[in-house]
């Protein structure tokens, strides 16, 4: 029984140990799971791998930077080599240019020294590389002793440029110092004011050793006198002002001299004609001469004399303008008629004249001419002798100052029954052109004053010269055969204004219908007596009607 009992006891102990081991293993396995709950191994592995990747990227970036820097360094080295080659080529060119001017390079001596050193080198292999490098370097010459004066002028050798051998002309000239004689030396005169001001010095400004104020100027202002003295600046300003005045005077003199030199005769004549204060211009009609008659002193007040001033001036103009040299009988009859009609005219009739006949109430406008009379200079008028029987004019129902209506007559359209043959062989008489009798001196300007006396009334009347009578056949033949008188002398522009316009040539014939229409407006049955009546009636108004008639009957 002992054998079976031992077997079961051993089996029981084995089962207990297995149970203990299984419980222990379960406990250990449970404890390990609790320890790795906060951080799992996969997480740790991922973090470790990410750290490795970051380190790898940093290493790659640093490596790239190193490569780029190496490339830049290599490019810089290449540029330095190229620059070295270029500088060497430039140095060779400079040496060649210097050699043309006598420069001797020193590289031959260096090459000979290098060759001697290479021949003297021992061929031992035990020599260290440092000693070999030291032997390869050229032996430097000992620097010259620096015993020169530090205050001397700098030389090219001080900067290592003595081998360029620059020309000696650039060096400053060496002047030998002259021995100084103590007798010839004079003390330097210090600057002093011409009139120094004695000013009491304050205790702070008191000087004991030096009294030299050569660099200090008071400019005329001090504690004692706070006013500006006449110092150098004011004198300089006055001097400049005088110079400017002299310059302006010289410029004005030069300008005057230049104007006098460049002045032409026209400028000189204009300068002589011009006055500082010219009188107002006098307007007059050429050919209209006004004769001033001797005045008769009449008793009376000055006011009445001034009141009659306008009437007297009108009568004076009428008397002056009628003083013409005319030998025709018709003109003499007009003059006699004018003398007969003058006494009947009074002050009221003159003052009631129309505006183109009245001279106005201005007393300063004495001897003011009437509107100009346009006549043909040099053309004599021949009138036929008429009977001296005076025809009484008809009474006008309207205003006496109103001129009669002009008669529209075209004399050149009248048919002349007696046709005259024109003899071309006979020379046409040249009209006598005399301009001097029309162009005479104008009357002097008379100013209004208390001493002025009204001129006496004269028995003359102004009138327009009558137009010469020309037959129709003569004028037509003249224009037909283009027979023209000789050309008159040259006239000025002012005389051309008074010249009667020339009748144009008629190139087209007027038809019978037009002549019949025009004949209705022409009063061909009027007798000579009626014409003389109209002329005499218009003479009292300055013969305005005759002017209109002449304008309408003018042969264009």
Curated annotation (Swiss-Prot):
InterPro entries: SKA3. It comes from the Eukaryota. Residues 105-135 are annotated as: Disordered. Residues 118-134 have a biased composition (Basic and acidic residues). Keywords: Cell cycle, Cell division, Centromere, Chromosome, Cytoplasm, Cytoskeleton, Kinetochore, Microtubule, Mitosis. It is found in: Cytoplasm, Cytoskeleton, Spindle; Chromosome, Centromere, Kinetochore. GO terms for cellular component: cytoplasm; kinetochore; meiotic spindle; mitotic spindle; outer kinetochore; spindle microtubule. One of its GO terms (molecular function) is microtubule binding. CDD domains: SKA3_N (cd12957). Its main location: cytoplasm. GO terms for biological process: attachment of mitotic spindle microtubules to kinetochore; cell division; chromosome segregation; mitotic cell cycle; mitotic metaphase chromosome alignment; mitotic sister chromatid segregation; regulation of microtubule polymerization or depolymerization. Signal peptide: none annotated. Component of the SKA complex, composed of ska1, ska2 and ska3. PANTHER family: SPINDLE AND KINETOCHORE-ASSOCIATED PROTEIN 3. Belongs to the SKA3 family. Component of the SKA complex, a microtubule plus end-binding complex of the outer kinetochore that stabilizes spindle microtubule-kinetochore attachments, promotes alignment of chromosomes at the mitotic spindle equator (chromosome congression) and assists suppression of the spindle assembly checkpoint. Kinetochores, consisting of a centromere-associated inner segment and a microtubule-contacting outer segment, play a crucial role in chromosome segregation by mediating the physical connection between centromeric DNA and spindle microtubules. This is SKA complex subunit 3. It comes from Xenopus laevis. The lineage of its organism: Eukaryota, Metazoa, Chordata, Craniata, Vertebrata.
